[in-house]
Curated annotation (Swiss-Prot):
UniProt repeat feature WD, residue ranges: 13-44, 61-91, 103-133, 146-178, 190-220, 231-260, 281-311
Entry similarity comment: Belongs to the WD repeat G protein beta family. Ribosomal protein RACK1 subfamily.
Main location class: cytoplasm
GO molecular-function term, one example from the UniProt record: protein kinase C binding
UniProt keyword annotations, A-Z: Cytoplasm, Repeat, Ribonucleoprotein, Ribosomal protein, WD repeat
Name by which UniProt lists this protein: Small ribosomal subunit protein RACK1
InterPro entries given in the database record: G-protein_beta_WD-40_rep (IPR020472), RACK1-like (IPR045223), WD40/YVTN_repeat-like_dom_sf (IPR015943), WD40_repeat_CS (IPR019775), WD40_repeat_dom_sf (IPR036322), WD40_rpt (IPR001680)
Role of this protein: Involved in the recruitment, assembly and/or regulation of a variety of signaling molecules. Interacts with a wide variety of proteins and plays a role in many cellular processes. Required for VANGL2 membrane localization, inhibits Wnt signaling and regulates cellular polarization and oriented cell division during gastrulation.
Cell compartment(s), UniProt: Cytoplasm
Species name: Danio rerio (Zebrafish)
GO CC annotation terms, alphabetical: cytoplasm; cytosol; nucleus; ribonucleoprotein complex; ribosome
A GO biological-process term: regulation of protein localization
């Protein structure tokens, strides 16, 4: 008996690429998705065969593509970043913006909450990383030893005993920052192309990075060293660890690869069946990934504006 993924349905509502998806353990029937249509949709998951969920509310305010969205650990707030150069904090009960964060001089590409929700980090095309408090005040701008190109992704470690920020950029670098003094702790060198994404494991012990070279590189955050590399075979747009299995998922071009990190083997490869009359048409690319908090459901956002939903099932392959 092996675990495999079974497609469960789709979520239709966006009119632009789905750039990010966020889930929260507090509300298992709700997810958020960010899009190039400038909105964030709050979905109510119905898990029907036809429609896996319905758009409950649209969070409007950004004037350009929304690049990233995350949910606070209490499930009450969302944080978004946009190509309009700002971050926004949203009250999810009312759907309104409670704070606008102004300071970046170019598109914001990535945002994150610290484990205690008291700090916010953002990465931008202006090549800086900014640390903010929840009142929207920029407390620190990392410029020393910073990326020499766009900062494509920033993430906090969930482990409060090792307070760090991990970032990656179009300079092919993965950088680990000491949160206490915002100083560079480690440079992880090895990628041969620009980087799109970095993600930290649920226990904070390792991170994975990916981008143009199609390689998912795993790094030990405690030891500050490269562990191993998994070949994705196509540009990696998104990476995420399973919350309860030793799995890493990668959005590789139009498909999703799931690796079991114990044996470094592929558990499953997810391709959506697109019926197209024109075989030259580029298949939709997978641009975002998120697991449900219980690790049973995988949500994936695409360039055809849909979210596709898979579930872990026990198979007999």
């Amino acid at each position: 008996m092996t675990e495999q993924m079974t497609v469960r349905g789709t979520l239709k509502g966006h009119s632009g690429w789905v750039t990010q998806i966020a889930t929260t353990p507090q509300f298992p029937d709700m997810i958020l998705s960010a899009s190039r249509d400038k909105t964030i949709i709050m979905w109510k998951l119905t898990r029907d065969e036809t429609n896996y969920g319905i758009p409950q509310r649209a969070l409007r305010g950004h004037s350009h593509f929304v690049s990233d969205v995350v949910i606070s650990s209490d499930g009450q707030f969302a944080l978004s970043g946009s190509w309009d150069g700002t971050l926004r904090l949203w009250d999810l009960t009312t759907g309104t913006t409670t704070r606008r964060f102004v300071g970046h001089t170019k598109d914001v590409l990535s945002v994150a909450f610290s484990a205690d929700n008291r700090q916010i980090v953002s990465g931008s095309r202006d090549k800086t990383i900014k640390l903010w408090n929840t009142l929207g005040v920029c407390k620190y701008t990392i410029q020393d030893d910073s990326h020499t190109e766009w900062v494509s992704c920033v993430r906090f470690s969930p482990n409060s005993s090792n307070p760090i920020i991990v970032s990656c950029g179009w300079d092919k670098m993965v950088k680990v920052w000491n949160l206490a003094n915002c100083k560079l702790k480690t440079n992880h060198i090895g990628h041969t192309g620009y980087l799109n994404t970095v993600t930290v494991s649920p226990d904070g012990s390792l991170c994975a990075s990916g981008g143009k070279d199609g390689q998912a590189m795993l790094w030990d955050l405690n030891e500050g060293k490269h562990l191993y590399t998994l070949d994705g075979g196509d540009t990696i747009n998104a990476l995420c660890f399973s919350p309860n299995r030793y799995w890493l998922c990668a959005a590789t071009g139009p498909s999703i690869k799931i690796w079991d990190l114990e044996g470094k083997i592929i558990v499953d490869e997810l391709r959506q069946d697109i019926i197209t009359t024109n075989s030259k048409a580029e298949p939709p690319q997978c641009t975002s990934l998120a697991w449900s908090a219980d690790g049973q459901t995988l949500f994936a956002g695409y360039t055809d504006n849909l979210i596709r939903v898979w579930q872990v099932t026990i198979g007999t392959r």
